[in-house]
Amino acid sequence: SEEEVVTRDYIQSGKADLVCILVDASQLERSLYMLADFVGIRMPVMLVLNMMDVAEAAGKKIDVTAIEKRLGVPVLGFSAAETERYPEFFKKMVSAIKTPVCLDSGSLREELVGGGELAEKTDDIISRIEAALGDFEYGVCEKIWIAEKLLEKDKLICGVVNEMLPFARKNAIDAILDSEEGRDGGIL
């Protein structure tokens, strides 16, 4: 969407002190795609698990401390409807700005691709694309993020890579994607 492009452009500018990723705690698994999409972007981040009250009312137990420990970034269980909790939110945010932490794509790689044969194949494709990218850099984005976006056929990233990457590397990436998808014609 247009809003996503504006948000992504601002984040990639590197001007933000902190990015707060707000997810729906009552539908945590479905909501974490936003966090997964942020892995590979070198920006300080804080995860806010909103609607904790709704999650708890549905009988869901969310261990905020365990999530924070696993991700290595500040995590706050929160309910935006409970206005008395806003000082706690702001305190956590200020602390996250003073001690900035980025998501570590290396330590989270297994969670990103999951397990099993399909996950191994996806990880192999991403690794091969990363190698083909060579020393290519794009703002605050790591190569794993760029590789994932190329695999997803993200139009913006495909366009940037097409414009900036040498012809031989573009061909190498297209060959990787074509061989894995059994298709012809490339994305770049």
Question: For the regions a protein language model found, what residue spans apply to each?
Answer:
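Generic serine detector
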Residues: S1, S13, S26, S31, ...
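Conserved C-terminal guanine-recognition region of P-loop GTPase G domains, centered on the G4
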Residues: E2-L76
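Helical mechanochemical/support elements of P-loop NTPase systems and associated helical scaffolds
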Residues: E3-V6, K15, R30-M34, G59, ...
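Phenylalanine-focused residue identity feature
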Residues: F38, F78, F89-F90, F136, ...
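Structured core elements
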Residues: M46, L76-S79, I146, I187
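Canonical P-loop GTPase G-domain recognition
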Residues: D53-G114
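Extended helical scaffolds that flank P-loop GTPase cores
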Residues: G72, A96-T99, D104-L188
